[in-house]
Amino acid sequence: MSVKEHLIHNVHKEEHGHAHNKITVVGVGAVGMACAISILMKDLADELALVDVVEDKLRGEMLDLQHGSLFLRTPKIVSGKDYSVTANSKLVIITAGARQQEGESRLNLVQRNVNIFKFIIPNVVKHSPDCKLLVVSNPVDIWTYVAWKISGFPKHRVIGSGCNLDSARFRYLMGERLGIHSLSCHGWIVGEHGDSSVPVWSGVNVAGVSLKALHPELGTDADKEHWKEVHKQVVDSAYEVIKLKGYTSWAIGLSVADLAETVMKNLRRVHPISTMVKGMYGIKDDVFLSVPCVLGYHGITDVVMMTLKSEEEEKLRKSADTLWGIQKELQF
């Protein structure tokens, strides 16, 4: 008899069924691994699968996490180049994509990434036909559209991480100004993730007290307190971090884990995330932009219709036109 047979008396023969709360992360770069560790620390999955094309790095990352299993509550961490390892995932997080090369046009980069997504998405769909797709790769609004087109999934199951992080950065910076924790500072950034995002100043509040009511110039050029700078800092923050450390990872990883928690626990929290906005705010094309969405186990179930000023709506439409200009040139 083996040590195991001497030690353990079997009472019930378990059938090896599949995991009930499986999450997959596609891409084990800095962002993918920040997502992975943030999800593991929140105990959101009973199985975590990692996928990448770089096999040595992939296996190394898996082993490194497995060796920390004692300190985690996720019993199974697996990896593989073959997408069969992702089978029966409830949530699949896409962080993979090509980086822009020197002198390369944005459209050329976008087209190269379309070709990568044409490999990733069908493989994900084949092995997890009922999953929710959470797209993180940038430019996230375009990739969410591409993932939706290629997957054939209904729009509520294809989600972009969108402005969830922009809004978190905004609330952090607002809290720094006021000396209050960011959880108690409320403000929404919507629209395109990144440079042309739209801060909704009318909704900025602490304990239900509107800052705009206290200070009508809030967010305008006439504002002597320069609150507009807070939004500029949000837009510039990723560039600053990239300049200093070469990439962003921790904040986006934490933001993605926040979204994953809402999905896996069916919390029905409202997040500023990228969804199909055709028919909203006068937008006529198939584009994905961030608006406040009710998120849960089935994906995005509802959109909260914000009361936007005419110039805010105009900014959203302008972003939509820019995105559509790129999207309509893509070859699927």
UniProtKB/Swiss-Prot annotation:
Record GO biological process: lactate metabolic process
Binding locations of NAD(+): 29-57, 99, 138
EC number annotated for this UniProt entry: 1.1.1.27
Primary site of residence: cytoplasm
Active site, renumbered: H193 (proton acceptor)
Annotated keywords: Cytoplasm, NAD, Oxidoreductase
Keyword set includes Oxidoreductase: yes
Compartments it resides in: Cytoplasm
Keyword Transmembrane: no
Pathway per the UniProt entry: Fermentation; pyruvate fermentation to lactate; (S)-lactate from pyruvate: step 1/1
GO MF annotation list: L-lactate dehydrogenase activity
Binding site for substrate: R106, N138, R169, T248
Domain of life from the UniProt record: Eukaryota
Enzyme class, UniProt record, top EC level: oxidoreductase
Substrates-to-products reaction catalysed: (S)-lactate + NAD(+) = pyruvate + NADH + H(+)
Single GO cellular component term: cytoplasm
Entry function: Interconverts simultaneously and stereospecifically pyruvate and lactate with concomitant interconversion of NADH and NAD(+).
UniProt subunit comment: Homotetramer.
Family of this protein: Belongs to the LDH/MDH superfamily. LDH family.
PANTHER family linked: L-2-HYDROXYCARBOXYLATE DEHYDROGENASE (NAD(P)(+)), L-LACTATE DEHYDROGENASE A CHAIN
Protein name, entry field: L-lactate dehydrogenase A chain
Gene: LDHA
